[in-house]
Design a protein with these regions (language model features):
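Cationic, amphipathic, low-complexity segments that mediate targeting or membrane/lipid association
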Residues: 2-20
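Replication-associated primase and helicase/ATPase modules
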Residues: 19-22, 33
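Class I S-adenosyl-L-methionine
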Residues: 34-267
Length: 267
């Protein structure tokens, strides 16, 4: 015998309370990670800086994962090949990164990465799916940069294989990873640009000779060539996967980098 439906019966009241509590809990947790329910992204940022926004003119939308660099989250190292110069010139506090709440959100994301990677990965995958769906609705192409302020070997964590149709890209100071990319040993949907510092110029030249690209920070006007390789303007957009091979990606010094005395910035 079926019982008559009760709009405000005990079961209905219980489920309303349960779902209200669950939604409030989830919203609070995501807010602590820097999430806005209106953005519908947990970990990724879209349109958070001027440079990546320039890609829109080329038909691309960029989502970036910003973590707390180095060991600032009080966990493991996320920039294993950082030098003194790049540490001092780090753009971690540039733009919105200057705000305390933004830095705290990045710290919490990084702590989640180390403390509960399963949850972190689930949130990241949900973000990528939502971002791609949003791009499709807008008639834009999606690209994702996971190392906005970190240098993690994401190819070992199953991210790129899970989204074979999404273009991923990063900068890295790992010569091993950069050479792997130059030799075609990275996932086909992942583009990697090696970052020169004051302590890895020899490796940077090796990467260029192997067919890879290298980002170099210059103090003023970008030269036509560096170490015999053509220089392209890397400040015009952040779409590194559109660059030709065997080029130097010239970047003008910004923020603390303008006062560099380590050799990280090329005079």
């Amino acid at each position: 015998m079926m019982l008559p439906y009760q709009k405000n019966g005990p079961a209905q009241v219980f489920f309303r309370i349960f779902f209200d509590f669950f939604f409030a809990f989830f919203s609070c947790k995501c807010a602590r990670l820097g999430y806005s329910s209106r953005m519908k992204l947990n970990l990724l940022s879209v349109g958070a800086d001027a440079k990546t926004s320039k890609g829109e003119a080329f038909g691309w939308l960029t989502a970036i994962l910003y973590l707390a660099p180095a060991r600032q989250a009080g966990r493991g190292e996320v920039c294993t090949h950082r030098s003194v110069g790049c540490t001092l010139a780090c753009l971690y506090t540039a733009g919105r990164g200057k705000m305390s709440n933004v830095q705290q959100a990045r710290i919490r994301r990084t702590q989640l990465f180390f403390d509960d990677f399963a949850t972190f990965k689930a949130l990241l995958f949900a973000d990528i799916r939502a971002f791609v769906a949003s791009c499709e609705k807008q008639g834009m192409r999606a690209c994702v940069r996971l190392n906005g302020t970190s240098d993690i070997a994401w190819e070992r964590l199953g991210v790129f294989a899970a989204f074979p149709s999404v273009q991923f890209y990063d900068y890295s100071k790992s010569p091993i990873r950069a050479l792997q990319f130059a030799k075609g040993a990275m996932p086909s949907n992942y583009h990697l640009t090696f970052s020169r510092s004051e302590s890895n110029e020899a490796q940077a030249i090796d990467v260029l000779r192997a067919g890879g690209n290298v980002a170099v920070v210059f103090a003023s006007i970008l030269p036509a060539t560096w170490q015999g390789f053509p220089v392209v303007n890397g400040d015009e957009s952040d779409l590194r996967f559109l660059d030709s091979r065997n080029v130097v990606v010239g970047l003008k010094a910004k923020g603390a980098g303008k006062k560099d005395a380590t050799g990280f910035v090329v005079a």
